[in-house]
Amino acid sequence: MRKPMVAGNWKMNGSLALVNDMGRALADVDCSAVDVLVCPPFPYIGPLRRAVPDESGVALGGQDVSRYDSGAYTGEVAGAMLAEMGCRHVIVGHSERRAMHAETDEVVVDKVQAALRAGLTPIVCVGETLEARDAGETEQVVGRQLDAVLELGGFVVEKLVLAYEPVWAIGTGRTASPEQAQAVHAFIRQRAADALGDELAQRLPILYGGSVKPGNARELFGCADVDGGLIGGASLDPDGFLEIISAARP
């Protein structure tokens, strides 16, 4: 059985005050039935690590990682640096990185491999724009993004978490219906099964990321192939984040 995960992606938001508030909120969270992860901006990883008690079981992650391990790459952050700060996971291929920083599937694959070299678990994002969905190209776009990662082979893919983020539902207030989310998640799992076998595909966690809120989380997480969520704006509210975590518990 796949253990649910709720991962908070603060994006370029937050403050030291929020770090402290979140630390207090998560101090007593029960992670026995659901994995809880928070990905703050890079400067807040250290403070959040100190604010959240080690015994809580809450994990920390980065929002991005360099495809390079070290060198003259101003502004980049290496996987080993994230690991040294206590991160266990890192988001790779988020739609905002793909769109705003022109990250190609090739770059995403390089970052996946860089994260794994550092001992991090990549959360690999795939998803389609509104134009692609309206054109009936959801499976074509998501399949292409997914295939680039699946080609790395089962030994790599079994170490990943996938996240489906319909770009048209990120920060827009629009949310994929549970039926829409389940349909794409089922497609992703079947694509993985076709490439690498059903046993691996059934173990592969697939998160949903697209305007998940306390009010819709339970219904979305109730879908057969949805294994939790990659939470954006709602992860900035400690009380709301706790509600979403509660909704993910089996």
From Swiss-Prot:
Please indicate which superkingdom the organism of origin belongs to: Bacteria
Q: What is its EC number?
A: 5.3.1.1
The record places the active site at: H94 (electrophile), E165 (proton acceptor)
Q: Where in the cell is it found?
A: Cytoplasm
- Catalytic activity annotation: D-glyceraldehyde 3-phosphate = dihydroxyacetone phosphate
Q: Where does substrate bind?
A: N9, W10, K11, G171, S211, G232, G233
Chief place of localization: cytoplasm
CDD domains recorded for this chain? TIM
Q: Name one Pfam family in it.
A: TIM
| Keywords noted in UniProt | Cytoplasm, Gluconeogenesis, Glycolysis, Isomerase
Q: In Gene Ontology terms, what is a biological process of this protein?
A: gluconeogenesis
Q: In which pathway does it act?
A: Carbohydrate biosynthesis; gluconeogenesis; Carbohydrate degradation; glycolysis; D-glyceraldehyde 3-phosphate from glycerone phosphate: step 1/1
Gene Ontology CC annotations of this record: cytosol
Do the record's keywords include Mitochondrion?
no
Cytoplasm listed as a keyword: yes
> One GO MF term, please?
triose-phosphate isomerase activity
Top-level EC class, please?
isomerase
Q: Which SUPFAM superfamilies match?
A: Triosephosphate isomerase (TIM)
Q: Which HAMAP family match?
A: TIM_B
Q: What biological function has been recorded for the protein in this entry?
A: Involved in the gluconeogenesis. Catalyzes stereospecifically the conversion of dihydroxyacetone phosphate (DHAP) to D-glyceraldehyde-3-phosphate (G3P).
What binding partners and quaternary form does the record give?
A: Homodimer.
Q: Which family does it belong to?
A: Belongs to the triosephosphate isomerase family.
Please state what the protein is called.
Answer: Triosephosphate isomerase
Gene symbol?
tpiA
